[in-house]
Amino acid sequence: LDGFFVQQYFWPSAKTEHVQYEHIDNEQRLREFCDAAAEAKCLAFDTEFVSEDTYRPQLCLIQVAADDRLAIIDPLAMNDVTPFWHLLARPGHETIVHAGREEFRFCLDAIGQRPANWFDIQIAAGFIGLEYPAAYSTLISKLVGKSLPKGETRTDWRKRPLSDKQLEYASQDVLYLKQIRDILANRLDELDRRAWLEDELESWLTQLEHSENTEQWRRVSGSAGLSARKLAIVREVWRWRDAEAASRNSPPKRILRDDLIVEIARRQTDNVVRIRSVRGMEHRHLQRHLETIAECVKRAEELPDHECPRPARKGDVSQPSLVLLGQFFSTALGCICRARELAPGLVGSVQDSRDLIAHHLGLTNSDTQLPRLMQGWRAKIIGPDIDKLLHGELGLRVSNPLADQPLSLEPFAKPTPNS
C-alpha cells in the first residue's frame, strides 16, 4: 500500500505554493460569494476556532474552496454568516473536510441542518490502510507530496488584524482537500469500499447529532461505576454546571471540575458544611454556589428509584479473563485490519474488543446494544475471523520478528471435545 502511494503520488522535496484567495469581511461580499458558489460541485472547507475560554468553541475563521475559487471568511467582522451554512446544506455538491467534528457542529448549531454529502478525508484514509486518525499534514505529505508550514500553529485566531502570513497559512488547510479526496475516492473504488465509507460517515454524523441533542452528563470523568442514586446526583449537579457555564459563556469545567462532581456524588450529602469540606470546594468562586449545589443533591436524593439513571454496564471489566482476552483480541484485530488494508484505529479500540468479549461471555445486559465490532461493515470484514478466534480455529503466531507487522493469523484444526 505504501509503495502504491509513494510511486504514484509522492514528490519528496515539494513545497506548498503561494495561494491566491479572497478575503471576505462583510456580509454583502459573503452573500455574493455564496451566490456564486451555489453551482459548485465541491465545497472543501475548514475552520479556525478557539475553545479554551468559552462555553462553545469560538469560530474565528472559515476557509473554503468552491471548485477553483478559494476564500477566507472572517466571522468576527460580521454579525451573520448563516448564508455560508445554508450554502453547505444545499443539495447538489459534496462537502469535503478533514476531521470535521467541529465544522459539522458549527453548521448544525447555526441552522439545524447537516452540510450536504459529507466526505471526511481522515475517515476515508482509514479505509485504505493509512493510519487513523491521520493529521492533515500527514495526508498531504503521503498523498500529495507537500509539506505544510508550521509557523502559525499557535496563532490566537481571535486577534485582529491577521497578517498575510497567517491568512495564507489558514488557506493551506483547504487547498489540497479536493485533491486528496479524489486520490482516496479512486482507491476506495478499487477496493470496493465506498459503501463502507458512506455507512461510517452516516453513523458518525448521526452520533454527532445525537450528542448535540443529548445531555452529556455520562461523560463526567470518574462517574463510571457509581450507583444509580449517585449517578442521579452527578446528573443534577452537571445540569446546574452546564446552565451556569452557558449563562457565563465559560468552559463548564472552569465552573466546577469533574472530579468534584464525582466526589460530591460519592458523599451523597446535601449538607452544605460537608460539601464545603470536599478538597477543592474551598475556592472563593465556588462558595456562593454551595447552597445551589446542595439543592441539586437534595433533588437527586428525592427522586423515585425508577427515575434514577441506570448505570451503563458493559460487563465486569475487572475480571482477569476479560482483561486478558480484550488485550489478545485487540492485537488480533490489528493483524486482521492490516491484512485487509484497514486502519486498526478506525475499526475498533481496546474497549471495543472488551465489549465484544463481554457480549460473547454473556456479561452484558440483554437489552444492551450489539458491540460496535458486531455491527455493519465491521461485522462483515472481521466477523468470520473473530468467530474463529473465539472458537480456537485461528491463532496468532510470530511470522517475522523484524517486519513492520511481525504477527500473523494461523489456522488451527477445530478442537474436538476430547482434545
Residue ranges and their predicted role:
Residues 30, 52-54:
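Short N-terminal binding/cap micro-motifs at the start of the first secondary-structure element
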Residues 9-43, 47:
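N-terminal accessory regions of nucleic-acid-interacting proteins
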Residues 54-58, 72-75:
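Short, glycine/acidic-enriched capping/hinge loops at junctions between secondary-structure elements
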